[in-house]
């Protein structure tokens, strides 16, 4: 039991957030609502779990209301599988052999998960995991992962955090590159960090005449001053 359990390593932060694991049944969400904690949805990595996601949050809300608590979607974490590369074909090449062994030797062979059958080939594994309706993984480009995360937001009605499941489908180098691509291109996009840049660019495009007039006014001011005009001339002819 957990009666005499102790942590061997204490957390670095004094106030540590708690999250209840949730799969397909209402149990995890109900427990989170009862105690007002966050949720870690690991069922999102299976087809049945994905199908259950749209109704999952209501279990937490109902339990929270019953016990006088409040739950916030920002505390809902969704776990996802992915391997990202510059192209879909490259991601496929990098992940297929490791995915094949992971499924056949670990998930089906060691864990013997109910309903999980071994793949017959590496390519079949990639197709079934990432390129069918209800696929549980993203094996592709940063844009593919961005699109899938946005689909998950629509499917669930909104959540707070995406957590990538660390696996060993690809080599250490390619796995590191995958996470680098996620950090560089996926995180800024899904967190809205690029919105201001795009708005600024669009403003410049739509107000080009205003900027041109300002530039002309500056040039007129320079040319009306003999010393300034000479300095500009020298600067423009300098090697």
Set out the residue ranges of the language-model regions.
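Extended catalytic-interface subdomain
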Residues: 1-12, 17-24, 30-31
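An alpha-helical appendage that flanks or caps ligand/catalytic pockets
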Residues: 1-8, 48-160, 187, 191-239
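Hydrophobic faces of well-ordered beta-strands that scaffold small-molecule active sites
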Residues: 18-22, 37-42, 74-81, 162-164
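Active-site-proximal loop/turn and secondary-structure-junction residues that shape catalytic pockets
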Residues: 24, 45-46, 82-84, 168
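A conserved active-site cap/scaffold subdomain adjacent to cofactor or substrate pockets
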Residues: 27-57, 75
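Glycine-rich, proline-tolerant flexible connector loops at the mouths of alpha/beta enzymes
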Residues: 44-50, 163-175
């Amino acid at each position: 039991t957990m009666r005499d359990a102790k942590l061997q390593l204490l957390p670095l932060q004094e106030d540590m957030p708690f999250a209840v694991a949730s799969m397909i049944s209402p149990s995890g969400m109900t427990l989170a609502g009862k105690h007002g904690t966050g949720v870690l949805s690991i069922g999102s990595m299976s087809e049945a779990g994905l199908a259950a996601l749209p109704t999952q949050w209501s279990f937490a809300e109902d339990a929270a209301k019953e016990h006088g608590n409040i739950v916030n979607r920002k505390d809902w974490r969704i776990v996802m599988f992915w391997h990202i590369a510059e192209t879909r074909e490259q991601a496929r090449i990098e992940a297929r052999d490791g995915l094949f062994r992971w499924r056949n030797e670990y998930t089906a062979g060691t864990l013997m998960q109910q309903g999980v059958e071994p793949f017959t080939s590496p390519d079949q594994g990639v197709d079934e995991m990432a390129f069918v309706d209800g696929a549980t993984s993203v094996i592709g480009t940063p844009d593919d992962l961005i699109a899938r995360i946005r689909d998950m937001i629509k499917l669930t009605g909104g959540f707070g955090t995406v957590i990538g499941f660390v696996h060993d489908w690809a080599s250490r180098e390619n796995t590191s590159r995958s996470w680098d691509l996620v950090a560089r291109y996926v995180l800024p996009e899904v967190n809205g960090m690029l919105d201001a840049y795009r708005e600024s660019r669009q403003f410049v495009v739509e107000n080009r005449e205003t900027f041109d007039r300002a530039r002309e006014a500056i040039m007129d001011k320079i040319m009306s001053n003999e010393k300034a005009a000479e300095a500009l001339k020298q600067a423009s002819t300098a090697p």
